[in-house]
Amino acid sequence: MRLFKKRNTISERHVKANKRAEDLVPSGLMQRCPNCGLEFFARRLDKYKTCPDCDYGFRLTARERLAWLCEESEEWFKDIQPSDPLHFPNYEAKVAAGKKKTGLNEAVWTGLAKIGGQETALAIMDPFFIMGSLGQMTGEKLTRLIEAATEKRLPVVVFTASGGARMQEGIYSLMQMAKVVNAINRHKAAGLLYLVVLTDPTTGGVTASFASEGDITLAEAHAMVAFAGRRVIEQTIHEQLPKDAQRAETVLKHGFIDRIVLRQEEKETLAWLLKYGGMQDD
């Protein structure tokens, strides 16, 4: 029985990590691509923050994306603040952390912008603000943006990046799905263009509502596009999903996305679509 109680020390005898040396390695020196697994020096990332091997787009803050996407921009509705209708424990602290991390008042930047010289109403969701979750005021900002675009007869471009509905706001969060989609339907009824760009991750209630309503739907390479999480599905069907089941390429293959666009090509592609797809007869 002593044999089974013997401690395995092979790794301790043959692989000894130098803890002091590890402490000398600067934080953030290396990056690992979550899609292909490539490890590379972080300095290889440019403003687009894409993997040098597979073109996976690392997550960006709304302001990082705004910096290379638009020549001009004007933020709208920046005074709208998140609400706490359920007085959820620690929610205010999460909101404060999200504000500090992103410089935004909510999980979405909204405003007027010029992309390749084309004027548009623009919304960019920020995955670093409570995972880009859809809260009551997130929905309010999106709805006001779309309604203003309808009134001014402007196209709308929305970049989605979200973990879904914000659980800390309960039913108030879920109501935003219908609210935003209704605004989109009125926008479309006015003969105006609505473009969506799906980025990593686009999931949950956002996928089930305004992310799926685009006249034209683009997606970034290898972005996660899903409704329920992988573990939830696997535990329900008692089967393991294919590795790429919730990737943009698979969603494209099944007809729910029109095209996958590399980040370096997004500005040019959107400018072309806005120029020719967003033209309106006076």
From Swiss-Prot:
It comes from the Bacteria. Disulfide bonds: none annotated. It is found in: Cytoplasm. Binds 1 zinc ion per subunit. It holds the Pfam family Carboxyl_trans. The lineage of its organism: Bacteria, Bacillati, Bacillota, Bacilli, Lactobacillales. Its cofactor is Zn(2+). It catalyses: N(6)-carboxybiotinyl-L-lysyl-[protein] + acetyl-CoA = N(6)-biotinyl-L-lysyl-[protein] + malonyl-CoA. One of its GO terms (molecular function) is ATP binding. PROSITE patterns: COA_CT_NTER. Its EC number is 2.1.3.15. The keyword Transcription regulation does not apply. The keyword Translocase does not apply. This is Acetyl-coenzyme A carboxylase carboxyl transferase subunit beta. GO terms for biological process: fatty acid biosynthetic process; malonyl-CoA biosynthetic process. Residues 29-282 form the CoA carboxyltransferase N-terminal domain. Keywords: ATP-binding, Cytoplasm, Fatty acid biosynthesis, Fatty acid metabolism, Lipid biosynthesis, Lipid metabolism, Metal-binding, Nucleotide-binding, Transferase, Zinc, Zinc-finger. Component of the acetyl coenzyme A carboxylase (ACC) complex. Biotin carboxylase (BC) catalyzes the carboxylation of biotin on its carrier protein (BCCP) and then the CO(2) group is transferred by the transcarboxylase to acetyl-CoA to form malonyl-CoA. Coiled coil: none annotated. Zn(2+) binds at residues 33, 36, 51, 54. Gene3D superfamilies: 2-enoyl-CoA Hydratase, Chain A, domain 1. Belongs to the AccD/PCCB family.
